[in-house]
Amino acid sequence: WQSAPGLISGVTLADGRISFKIAGPGNAVIAVKDGAILWSWHIWYPEAEVAGLNSKTGYEVMNMNLGAMHNTPGDVGSYGLLYQWGRKDPFPAAPTLTGTTATVGAPIYDGDNNEIKITNSSQSSTADNNLAFAIANPTVCLSNYAQFNTSRDWLQADMSNDALWGNPKGAERNETNDFLNKGAKSFYDPCPVGWRVPPADVFRNFTASGGYAWVIDDFDIADISGDGAKSLADYDYGWTFNLSDSASSYFPAAARFDGSYAMLMGSMSGLWGSYWGNAPYPGDMFQGGAYSVLSFQIKDTAGNEMITTSPAGGGARADAYSVRCIRE
């Protein structure tokens, strides 16, 4: 698929290499087929230059979301793309800063410039909930509805794979509660060459405790409004968090795909932000979870004010979240 008609042209396969022409900034997924899709690659051409920002936690953090065009606060071009945990292929986020329950992902087009849809797997069977199907069907969001009570993974519960994004032991901690394992780039890691999905502790400085917070004064955010105080006046469809004493970065609230219904939660666009890490989440709360390295919201599903931020929580692997890469 391509994010705009005519974005990709001249696709050829020769001597084991794929060549193509790209007309301008945007996103695309190019696949090689032998009847069925054998493999696919995400092509990302942002408007702004990708760069790294140093952080208090010691990681060099990418300056925009994976798949974003730039990182301008209050601009939908900052949303980027959404990923089910462990999958390499993305889904489009909302086309507008805010949305409704009827909002679907931004339009995408096939090689003939016809609009195509992100579809979902069966909600009554897990027959297609396997890695081979995921690779062969990059535009299908895999639902966990049929196994929701036993696993929140998009893979069948007995096929769950903690190593998909390169950090199978990433949940292990020491006696001072520090994460022991940082992981490494994996075969299915969606980040560009030289970058990878971050470990669980990458944004622990974003709250005073390093954990769940519901008081804005406990968020390590930039004073965007310039009024000398931390408040919702500093929120612009996302927060600008301080990565270090000298660097901050905007993290947009691009919402997410719900893993059970395998559809974009469009009404939460601009209100909820969720970002994946590379580590599995301990199974004592629920099976099929992974670490979210950043989750925040300013309203609940009923539209009531509910301001929270968590830099290390659990999420369902079937949900599709944003990704903020770090330098390898």
Regions found by a protein language model. Give the residues of each.
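C-terminal, surface-exposed recognition/capping segments
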Residues: 29, 68, 151-328
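Short, compositionally biased
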Residues: 1-185, 281, 317-319, 327-328
